[in-house]
Structures are given as structure tokens and as C-alpha cells.
Amino acid sequence: MNVTMHSKKLLKPSIPTPNHLQKLNLSLLDQIQIPFYVGLIFHYETLSDNSDITLSKLESSLSETLTLYYHVAGRYNGTDCVIECNDQGIGYVETAFDVELHQFLLGEESNNLDLLVGLSGFLSETETPPLAAIQLNMFKCGGLVIGAQFNHIIGDMFTMSTFMNSWAKACRVGIKEVAHPTFGLAPLMPSAKVLNIPPPPSFEGVKFVSKRFVFNENAITRLRKEATEEDGDGDDDQKKKRPSRVDLVTAFLSKSLIEMDCAKKEQTKSRPSLMVHMMNLRKRTKLALENDVSGNFFIVVNAESKITVAPKITDLTESLGSACGEIISEVAKVDDAEVVSSMVLNSVREFYYEWGKGEKNVFLYTSWCRFPLYEVDFGWGIPSLVDTTAVPFGLIVLMDEAPAGDGIAVRACLSEHDMIQFQQHHQLLSYVS
């Protein structure tokens, strides 16, 4: 397989950013993010016959979209905790693959890196790298794969998916039809000079491997049935609680990882476990904010399970449900931004403390299910597949398996040693494809 790079440049907004918008203050919630790049990959099986026109339209509409999301084309100033919206641009690459898309998909999963390979120079070779980068990959069959990377400092998955849908709409019907983003978090929750939170642990020298596993609808139905049977001696109230598919898959994966931990130590008893999830706070508080506010606006959910011997799936879903329910109940009463900031900081402190201490199993998850990633339509239909890429630490991403249905695709990023055990776990193999 050969990959030809046809274009590599910094793409700037189509018109300059006005002087009064050239500094965007970051919020406290932006400030505390680990500044890594989140990757998104959108597969489109068939485009129009003229790929040159398609690529030109994608480029021009992206440049127009950057006039609304002007901060994305700027640079991060960590000293002042602002984005300097100076129109330096985002990374932009066009490539051509000499194979058909279905052949590419049959290859090794590491090929995902090929879909972003042209962006690596942008993101690593400069002192002030772009905050985002896009790579357009054309295939012999007329298929297109769009790879996107966003620095987490500029926003969460809600913000990233909104940007992609805005770009798609600009390409499909014109920039005038695209809603302007709102930036209301920093005035309410300004950045701080001193954060007083422990740093995340260092994983220098650890090789992480990323693999994709799919729980289709049938597998989730089977998993729910098994969990019910497993808890056959539980009380009636617990049986009435129906965990979400995200909680169910999270609990199953955590159970598998706990069993791996026991096997690694040749013990029947595991350490206590902490399941960590991220919860979108939009529409959950009483703060005077737009429902589609851009930036990072989520809280860390720390769900602890103290059961150290053969935990059941229902034990773990109960821990998740209890932790999530408590936060939902608390934030629903809050109309003070300082209280929200304090809650978020405390959740991050607890997570980083336990993550670094090493006395508990810490399983880090994030769910992108129900985010409109499968609605990113540039004019030739929705993507047939949406995926993500590896990150430099242990993380399990849960995504919708397909445009419709209740299946879940899992992108697991684990250490090389743990991944070998994980993908051979007998129960996991009975559910995933």
C-alpha cells in the first residue's frame, strides 16, 4: 500500500479574525485538561465522481468554518491561559491511497495511524503547535476518510462533534446556515493562578496499544440477560433497576480487567477498583449558560467498588449508577458557578490522587455514545463508520457502533502487556466481534 501526499499546509480562516476577538480566555475547566490530542476518524464509502471538486469544497468550507471557530486556528498561551486567535491556522493534509477503502479496513488496526500520519509534523515539531489538524484521505474506490485531531484544551467531545457538524453543514448548504458557537464558560469560571491539584501520573516508557472491539445489539441483550441471571439472588429493588448499555458494558469490561489483575498477581482477591467516567454538564445545572456552550464542560465521575472477590456485573453497575445519580442530583440544584468549579476540581483531585497512588485498580472510560458523530454529513451522506485513535495513557472509549441501533464499539488503549491478556479474555471473546 502506497500513500501519496498531495497537500500539506496550515489552513487559515477565510477572513481575518477581528481585533476584538483575538484573545479568548480559557475557563478553569479548560485549564485543568491534559493537553493531548483527541482523534476522530470518519469513513465515507462513496463520494461524487469528481474528487478534486469534493476536496476543494471541503477545504474552502473548512476555512469558512474557522471564521466562526476562530480560536481553533489560534495558539495556546499557557502563561496567560488564553488562546491567541491570531489566524496562524490548523494543520491540513490531503493524501491518496492506492487501495480501495474496504481493502484498507481489512488491514492491521495500526493503519488508523496512516489516516493521520501527515499531521504528526504539525503537532510535534513546533513549540506552539496548531490546536487542531485535519487529514483528507482519498481511496481508489472513491471513498474518503477524514481524520481530525483536536487539542483537548479547546473543548470536550460535545465541542468537537459540534465543530465537525458545523463544518459539514457549511460544506452541504453554506456557511450562512451555520450557527455561531458561544463562549460563556470563562466569564463564569475563570482560570486560576494556583490549581492545587496533583499532576496526573507519568507513563513515560510505557508502550500503549489500541484495539477496537464491538458489542452488537445482540451481545448487549445477552450481556443484560447474563447480568440478571448472575444476580438471581438479588433483592427486588435492584432487579427493577435497568442499567444503561454504557453502564452495562463499562461494568463488564471492569469485571474482566479486575479478573486480569487477580490473574497477574496469582490471587483470588483483587484491589478495590475505581471506575472513572466523564459526564457532560450541559443542561444539568441552573447556570445561565447556552445549552450548546463551547469548551470543556464536564465532570469526572469516580465510582468506587470495594468488592474485591469475584464482583458481579450488577455490583459494578450499581456502583456506577449510584455515583452518577448522586452527581446528577447535586448539580441540578446548583446556580453558582463557583460551586460547579469546586465540584469539578474535587472530582479531578480524587481521580488524579487515586490514579497516581496505585493502590486501586483505576479504569478510565469516556462515553461518546449519543454524540452526533454519525450525523456529520458533508453532502454525500452520513459516515459508515466513526472511530478514534490511541492516546498516551490507559483509556477505554465507548462509541455508537453504527448510525442506528444500540450496539457499542469499544476502543481500548492499554499497555502492551495488558492488551495481550485483555484480548484473550475468555468472557470478552464470547461477546465481542
Swiss-Prot record:
Q: Which residues form a coiled coil?
A: none
Record field: catalytic activity: benzyl alcohol + acetyl-CoA = benzyl acetate + CoA; (E)-cinnamyl alcohol + acetyl-CoA = (E)-cinnamyl acetate + CoA
Q: Which GO terms describe its molecular function?
A: acetyl-coenzyme A:acetyl alcohol acetyltransferase activity
The EC number(s) attached to this protein equal 2.3.1.224
List the active site: H152 (proton acceptor), D377 (proton acceptor)
What does its PTM field state? Answer: The N-terminus is blocked.
- Enumerate the UniProt keywords alphabetically: Acyltransferase, Transferase
Where is it made, tissue-wise?
Expressed in petals, style, sepals and stamens. Very low expression in stigma and not detected in leaves.
Q: What's the family? A: Belongs to the plant acyltransferase family.
- What does it do? Involved in the biosynthesis of benzyl acetate, a major constituent of the floral scent. Can use benzylalcohol, cinnamylalcohol, 3-cis-hexene-1-ol or heptanol as substrates. Has some activity with 2-phenylethanol and 2-naphtalene-ethanol, but no activity with linalool, 2-hydroxybenzylalcohol, 3-hydroxybenzylalcohol or 4-hydroxybenzylalcohol.
Name recorded for this polypeptide: Acetyl-CoA-benzylalcohol acetyltransferase
Q: What gene is behind this protein?
A: BEAT
